[in-house]
A protein has these predicted regions:
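N-terminal auxiliary segments of SAM/dcSAM-dependent transferases
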Residues: 1-33
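The AdoMet/dcAdoMet-binding core of the Class I SAM-like
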Residues: 47-133
Length: 133
């Protein structure tokens, strides 16, 4: 069993205070990893079906044989991981505004570990998606 609550990382960012934490939900007997921005819940790994669907639905409609995919926003990485689950993807570039989020993936402190960082098809870029896309 884990600690009931653990702050994994704290960073000041251009958007405010960013916290990565893990807490135990006793009723479900599981840990949940959460991202908090300025004391507001941003995301968690409690329910990731929508993040996975965000990748799988368009990938199912894509006719390209070896597509190069661009994703705006990395978060906990479930959308990117779902894209890479399609073996025909040639490359995936993920643009993330907050440097600590990219660092978490490189350090392997998230539930996916270093899965994205270790995949040679995946490039994580710090920047403003709308300015770079």
């Amino acid at each position: 069993m884990s600690h009931f609550f653990e702050e994994l990382d704290y960073s000041k960012t251009p958007l405010g205070e960013l916290v990565l934490r893990r807490r135990r939900i006793l009723k479900l007997d599981r840990d949940v990893v959460e991202v908090i921005l300025n004391d507001e819940h941003l995301m968690s790994d409690y329910f990731t079906v929508s993040e996975v669907a965000l990748a799988n639905i368009p990938m199912a409609l894509l006719a390209a044989d070896a597509p190069d995919i661009l994703v705006g926003g990395l978060g906990l990485g479930y959308t990117a991981d779902a894209v890479l689950g399609h073996d025909h993807v040639r490359s995936l570039t993920v643009i993330e505004y907050l440097a600590p989020v990219i660092r978490w993936h490189h350090q392997g402190v998230l539930p996916l570990g270093t899965t994205l960082s270790d995949d040679p098809r995946c490039t994580l870029v710090e920047g403003d998606f709308f300015a770079l896309a």
